[in-house]
Amino acid sequence: MAEAISKLAEQNGSQVGYTMGELMVASAAREIRDSEVVFVGMRLPLIAFVVAKRTHAPNAVGLFENGVIRTTPAAELIYTMADPPNILGATQCLDMLSVMSLLQSGRVHLGFLGAAEVDRYGNLNSTQVRGPKGLVRLPGSGGACDIASLAQRFVVSLDHDRQRLPERVSYITSPGNGDGKNWRQRVGLPRGGPSAVLRQKQFCVLMMMARLTSHRFIPA
């Protein structure tokens, strides 16, 4: 059934000149403001950065965790942040410590993150989830906890699934607004927090059209 809905959604999207994936990219691109410094990441946010640069945010600057800083998108498709096209033509090639220092100093405006779960307060879990056979270990934080803690704001991108949107995550890998109630200030995270989650939602209403929804989190 899910496959049938996805196929129908893609067909309906094509009738108006775009696919659901393209709509997700456009929505992510709109989160990038001109002249902002952005922790880009990979996959969907990487394409969103290119779209933003070519439309409304020509002065945005892209950061990558491996130390690459770009004021122009890579000239060719990249699969990892260390691929040669991402190095060629970079504004700077530093190291992880240097770009994380930019983050710590408050000079990173936006970061794009993914997770296995996100709750109503914007807390992210990418460490462990409970499956049919018990706990399942996941890859963990990477740089996500740093970005969630220290960027001026962050945006979450994930596929819509009820299990991935619990009331409260079972494990906080990367902090959003904790339990609310000025939590970030109380624990020493005076700036930042989640601003939006971008998700592709599938539902059945008449023609079962798929929609992109942008959910705003409960503030700190």
Language-model segments: residues:
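N-terminal active-site beta-alpha-beta segment that forms phosphate/nucleotide-binding
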Residues: 6-89
